[in-house]
């Protein structure tokens, strides 16, 4: 990284990720990716771009920043899209309509392409960071990230 958004959105499978977790049915938490896009081709600069979250599952009334929008199907998964203006460039969140504890070879290109098409970021920006884990709001004991990887082809 960094990887040009134009390359991701235009090349199927350019950036893929797999993630597997073990969850519990108590507390309030979300199991998500935190992905950062920046207009500057640097991983060392302050992010003035877009935070993209991918929520695989959540319980306890947690919800993303902003407001719920449309339901879309991207890379074979049905998502509810949320958008909020928190942070420098806002946050777009894709919330899985069928909660899951794992994804395998999830292609980030279609999600990036959607964000560009909706004007949340520009095609000239760069993917600078991909993180995954839990955001425990209350409790969280027993939540485990079992595996995580990102592949740039």
Residue ranges and their predicted role:
Residues 1-4, 83, 93-97, 127, ...:
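Generic preference for hydrophobic/aromatic residues in regular secondary structure cores
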């Amino acid at each position: 990284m960094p990887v040009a958004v134009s390359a991701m959105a235009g090349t199927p499978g350019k950036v893929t990720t797999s993630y597997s977790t073990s969850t519990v049915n108590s507390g309030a938490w979300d199991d998500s990716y935190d992905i950062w896009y920046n207009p500057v081709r640097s991983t060392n600069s302050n992010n003035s771009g877009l935070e993209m979250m991918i929520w695989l599952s959540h319980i306890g009334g947690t919800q993303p920043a902003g407001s719920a929008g449309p339901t879309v199907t991207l890379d074979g998964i049905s998502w509810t899209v949320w958008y909020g203006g928190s942070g420098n460039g806002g946050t777009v969140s894709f919330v899985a309509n069928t909660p899951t504890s794992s994804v395998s070879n999830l292609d980030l290109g279609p999600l990036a392409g959607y964000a560009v098409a909706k004007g949340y970021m520009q095609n000239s920006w760069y993917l600078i960071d991909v993180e995954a884990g839990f955001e425990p709001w209350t409790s969280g004991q027993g939540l485990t990230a079992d595996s995580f990887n990102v592949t740039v082809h």
